[in-house]
Amino acid sequence: MPRKGHIAKRDVLPDPLYNSKVVTKLINSIMLDGKRGVAQKICYDAFEIIAEKSGKDAMEVFETAMNNIMPLLEVKARRIGGATYQVPIEVRPERRQTLGIRWMLIAARKRGERSMRERLAGELLDASNNTGAAVKKREDTHKMAEANKAFAHYRY
């Protein structure tokens, strides 16, 4: 934690094709070794695959998938009197988005398809249909929070 006041959040610019900040965050998360062009190509190709397979607008499918992945609750370890409790807390909107993108990419990278664009498209389509590994991760997180509801009074 900084001693000299609050650190300003850096604002990301919307991507050129879809004019969306969430897509920019997705591209930034896909990016490895600063290769933004490669990451953009993967993302946009995945969106084209989604449009082909589903017959719907790719952004619509993406937004549905993100809403199905983003968690509402999570647990945070809190140490009280020598015991560590998993305390359920609500997730801030920005963290919800970050976790959703992170879980989606982890799930996509574990898939069996040949290229990353196919994996990402597959995971987004699955997530928009409320299936897939990323949605399962969200459900597991919610179950964990529900199971530890008794410790909610230890909230920060």
Curated annotation (Swiss-Prot):
Signal sequence segment: none
Top-rank lineage group of the source organism: Bacteria
CDD domains, A to Z: uS7_Bacteria
An example Gene Ontology biological process: translation
Keywords: Ribonucleoprotein, Ribosomal protein, RNA-binding, rRNA-binding, tRNA-binding
GO MF annotations in UniProt: mRNA binding; rRNA binding; structural constituent of ribosome; tRNA binding
Presence of keyword Ribonucleoprotein: yes
Record has rRNA-binding as a keyword: yes
Pfam families from the UniProt entry: Ribosomal_S7
GO cellular component entries: cytosolic small ribosomal subunit; ribosome
Family, per entry: Belongs to the universal ribosomal protein uS7 family.
Function per UniProt: One of the primary rRNA binding proteins, it binds directly to 16S rRNA where it nucleates assembly of the head domain of the 30S subunit. Is located at the subunit interface close to the decoding center, probably blocks exit of the E-site tRNA.
Record's subunit section: Part of the 30S ribosomal subunit. Contacts proteins S9 and S11.
Protein name: Small ribosomal subunit protein uS7
Gene that encodes the chain: rpsG
